[in-house]
Amino acid sequence: MSDTWLDKVHWTPDGLVPVIAQEAGTNKVLMFAWMNRESLRLTAETGQAVYWSRSRNRLWHKGEESGHVQKVHEIRLDCDEDVILILVEQVGGIACHTGRHNCFFQKLEQDGWVTDQAIIKNPEDIYHHE
């Protein structure tokens, strides 16, 4: 497969594109992340989500530490060609590093943020940093 399809993406000045991961089947939004050209190409090639970690300044294969990989069903480009949507199967049911199903577990109610999603698994049990 040629890489010319990557040229259609409108990358940010620093070579990134915002990505929304959505759960295939339920259409629930799981998380937001960034991809660079290489991570988007790897995602398409491997069928598993590979992001660009801005904090670690490196490729981040989703689930590389936790085992909670995202199997990609579909990759879509928005109408302005500057946002990617990936439909994924979330292995293990946990997309968020906090141990929750998705990263959008805080809801604005009145004048404050309320957590409305339980922790499925303690992050200390997921990430074994030594």
Curated annotation (Swiss-Prot):
GO biological process: L-histidine biosynthetic process
Transmembrane stretches, start-end: none
Entry's Gene Ontology cellular component terms: cytoplasm
Presence of keyword Hydrolase: yes
Pfam families: PRA-CH (PF01502)
UniProt-listed Gene3D superfamilies: Phosphoribosyl-AMP cyclohydrolase (3.10.20.810)
Family per similarity comment: Belongs to the PRA-CH family.
Subunit structure: Homodimer.
Name the record gives this protein: Phosphoribosyl-AMP cyclohydrolase
Organism from which the protein derives: Methylobacillus flagellatus (strain ATCC 51484 / DSM 6875 / VKM B-1610 / KT)
Lineage, top ranks: Bacteria, Pseudomonadati, Pseudomonadota, Betaproteobacteria, Nitrosomonadales
